[in-house]
């Protein structure tokens, strides 16, 4: 148990990058000696042209796995040679449907995960597949369709021989565990009180306790047993839509959530369903149709309120609407562990200003970092929630979807417009270099070994010092 505990608590001990944001989703690597200056014509070791996709590459000792989609709408899993970037194989995934997506999402947004040999991928428009190191399909498992108007975003996670996949949607949300060698279901738990979500879970190994997986979702954080799927502890206090992946230290988990309409001061007290039925339910059928609702704001926002898409508002739709209007955005530090409902017992601090929408927080060498659209970069004391420094990343005042990562005393931040900012890490961080690509970047950079990997819309680059 100790090696796993040390891995989860101190990600710098890990030299792998086998899943979204590397060791337990931390975004932290022990890579050293990476160049501050790089670009298409500077310090590029190799470049491989690829079809687009927002997923980040993941790595085994000799291979790189990533997902993509092409102009014909085909879904791909692609394997590269880690040494020279040559394509070793590419496999097409079935696409039985073409789900509605937000313009900021893509059909290949969830990142792959690898056990060091095999690759596991998840696509919104199919479900799960596993491939061997040479591209042979090991198994496939159709999942969905998903009632998520933005498309899915959470990546699969491995815990020993268990493959974990969260599937949060407007209705029918669930969390499931599968055997990584067969795809056979180990357990599945329904999440009826959860709407759409995009956050990738993280693992938690308490001293002397069983391995857990922590899942942020609408309004609450839940820790499940990896072995059984049983809820071990949970706490309320999150916003209604979670996109970033949390980060952890030994004692706390830092959960970021921002959703439109839930900034401080925007909360509303909405009447219970039973009360509005008495005055609005003209035909007395126990549901609310559009024409029965006098509030134009609800009618205008109908697609976000009618979660099950059946044309009327039922008790669940209304309760989720009430919860949504009461929710508040924030970066919250929760104390790890406990049993049962930890609401009101686990919050260490909460920060509610200048919050990113999509990028995950970064915890590196005792400092928390956030990057927000417009290039607003913030360092925070993880002990207190106090802002240490906040300023714009001059030269990269842009939209941000990729998450910050760190290695070798540097923090790397990539903007949608193709700017990659290199910062000197620290409470009073400094911008060292702004590197530019003539291409969009949605994928999170990977600092690994003696290379920095950058995926743009059309290529994967490996940078290093000659």
Give names to the regions the model predicted:
Residues 14-466:
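Noncatalytic, solvent-exposed loop/strand surfaces
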Residues 1-11:
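Bacterial N-terminal signal peptides
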């Amino acid at each position: 148990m100790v090696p796993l505990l040390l891995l989860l608590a101190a990600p710098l001990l890990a030299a792998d990058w086998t899943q979204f944001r590397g060791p337990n989703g931390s975004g932290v690597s022990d890579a050293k000696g990476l160049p501050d200056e790089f670009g298409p014509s500077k310090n590029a070791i190799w470049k491989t042209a690829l079809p687009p996709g927002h997923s980040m590459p993941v790595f085994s000792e000799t291979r790189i796995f990533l997902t993509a989609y092409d102009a014909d709408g085909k879904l791909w899993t692609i394997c590269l040679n880690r040494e020279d970037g040559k394509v070793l194989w590419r496999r097409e995934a079935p696409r039985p449907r073409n789900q509605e997506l937000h313009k900021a999402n893509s059909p290949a947004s969830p990142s792959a995960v690898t056990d060091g040999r095999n690759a596991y991928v998840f696509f919104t428009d199919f479900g799960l597949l596993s491939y061997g190191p040479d591209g042979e399909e090991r198994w496939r498992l159709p999942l969905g369709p998903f009632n998520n108007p933005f498309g899915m975003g959470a990546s699969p996670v491995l815990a020993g021989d268990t493959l974990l996949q969260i599937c949060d949607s407007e209705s029918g949300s669930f969390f499931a565990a599968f055997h990584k060698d067969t795809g056979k279901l180990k357990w599945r738990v329904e999440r009826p009180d959860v709407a759409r979500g995009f956050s990738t879970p993280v693992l938690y190994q308490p001293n002397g306790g069983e391995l857990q997986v922590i899942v942020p979702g609408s309004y609450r954080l839940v820790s499940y047993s990896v072995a059984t799927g049983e809820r071990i502890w949970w706490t309320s206090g999150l916003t209604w839509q979670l996109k970033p992946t949390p980060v952890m230290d030994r004692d706390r988990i830092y959960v970021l959530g921002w959703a439109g309409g839930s900034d401080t001061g925007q909360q509303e007290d909405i009447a219970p369903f039973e009360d509005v039925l008495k005055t609005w339910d003209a035909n007395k059928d126990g549901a609310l149709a559009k024409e029965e609702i006098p509030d134009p704001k609800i009618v205008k926002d109908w697609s976000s309120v009618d979660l099950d898409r059946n044309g009327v508002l039922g008790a669940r739709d209304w309760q989720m609407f009430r919860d949504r209007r009461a929710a508040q955005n924030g970066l919250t530090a929760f104390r790890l562990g406990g049993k049962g409902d930890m609401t009101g017992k686990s919050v260490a601090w909460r920060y509610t200003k200048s919050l990113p929408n999509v990028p995950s927080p970064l915890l590196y060498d005792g400092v928390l970092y956030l990057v927000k659209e417009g290039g607003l970069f913030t360092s925070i004391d993880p002990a207190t929630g106090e802002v240490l420094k906040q300023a714009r990343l001059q030269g990269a005042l842009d939209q941000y979807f990729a998450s910050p990562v760190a290695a070798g005393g540097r923090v790397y931040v990539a903007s949608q417009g193709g700017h990659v900012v290199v910062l000197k890490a620290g409470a009073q961080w400094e911008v060292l270099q702004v590197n530019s690509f003539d291409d969009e970047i949605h994928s999170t950079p990977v600092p690994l070994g003696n290379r920095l990997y950058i995926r743009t819309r059309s290529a994967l680059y490996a940078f290093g010092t000659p």
